[in-house]
């Protein structure tokens, strides 16, 4: 995964370049999480649009990319930013099957409005209700969350659906500490 990418990006590019230098005819990237896609516009004066910058760099050393459920807020496809073939794997069917098989009376919870598309699809496939929390993002690492009407969640097992597991875990720990 390319979560927390600053420490991983250059070693990844070096490894791809070394593979080609050592004789690889094709070098493909399989990354469950593609970094920097959230920065798809300038949110503050002087910021880089890192989704485009990172895509340009990756496209110079890899011949193709496979990823899972990328953040495509203002892009319609990865092809808008990557110059190599891309393939997106949808996680909803596997997650829904697991929830349906292992959780009694689930209610799926998305941490923010951006997660609604995934949560709604997992809920549909699992035959479960869902709700989405309201996230207030004040900065890259400064985020607040408001809980929905908890009466609708009574008698159900909550299942948090998030595309970035560390963020989901952080939210869970915050809720446990608050209760």
Q: What kind of feature is each model-predicted range?
A:
Residues 1-179:
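PRPP-associated nucleotide enzymes
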């Amino acid at each position: 995964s390319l979560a927390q990418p600053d420490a991983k990006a250059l070693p990844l590019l070096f490894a791809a370049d070394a593979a080609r230098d050592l004789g690889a005819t094709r070098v493909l990237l399989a990354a469950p999480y593609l970094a920097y896609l959230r920065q798809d516009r300038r949110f503050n004066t002087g910021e880089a649009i890192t989704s485009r910058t990172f895509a340009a760099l990756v496209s110079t050393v890899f011949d193709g990319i496979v990823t899972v459920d990328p953040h495509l807020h203002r892009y319609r496809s990865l092809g808008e930013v990557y110059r190599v073939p891309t393939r997106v794997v949808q996680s909803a069917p596997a997650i829904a099957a697991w929830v349906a098989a292992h959780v009694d009376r689930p209610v799926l919870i998305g941490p923010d409005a951006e997660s609604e598309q995934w949560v709604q699809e997992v809920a549909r496939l699992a035959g479960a209700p869902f709700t989405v929390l309201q996230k207030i993002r004040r900065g890259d690492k400064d985020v607040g969350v408001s809980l929905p009407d908890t009466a609708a969640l009574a008698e159900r097992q909550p299942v948090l659906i998030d595309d970035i597991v560390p963020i989901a875990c952080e939210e869970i720990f915050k809720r446990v500490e608050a209760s």
